[in-house]
């Protein structure tokens, strides 16, 4: 919460009334990853839960694969990457099942003390 408060104070000219909106467009807000890939109760799920999230948008090219494995996605890559964490193992399994990564938009409304859209 401290980071939200610091941004709230620093960007005071961007508030609407006493509310500041924080908007995010990310693969980290893609609901199927939250459900099946991110470790249960982990930081990525906690991050997701801060937001009101829009409809998920699948991306069959899996363009954010590199963010996890530092290489471009290809079906062959699934057998070559090092799946040494729960998230990496879950993502490889998820993609081998024919599912794809994607993205969504999220918003947080903060009033200077708390997130008010939860």
Map each language-model feature to its residues:
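Conserved acetyl-CoA-binding loop-helix of GNAT-fold acetyltransferases
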Residues: 1-11, 22
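Terminal substrate-recognition subdomain of acyl/acetyltransferases
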Residues: 17-118
């Amino acid at each position: 919460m401290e980071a939200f408060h610091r941004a709230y104070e620093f960007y005071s000219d961007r508030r609407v009334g006493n509310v500041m909106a924080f908007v995010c467009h990310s693969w980290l807000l893609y609901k199927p990853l939250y459900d099946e890939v991110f470790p249960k109760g982990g930081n990525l799920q906690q991050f997701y839960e801060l937001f009101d999230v829009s409809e998920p948008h699948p991306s069959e090219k899996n363009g954010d694969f590199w963010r996890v494995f530092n290489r471009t996605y290809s079906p062959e890559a699934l057998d070559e990457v090092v799946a040494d964490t729960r998230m990496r193992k879950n993502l490889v399994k998820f993609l081998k099942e024919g599912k794809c990564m994607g993205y969504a938009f999220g918003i947080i409304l903060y009033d200077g003390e708390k997130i008010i859209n939860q």
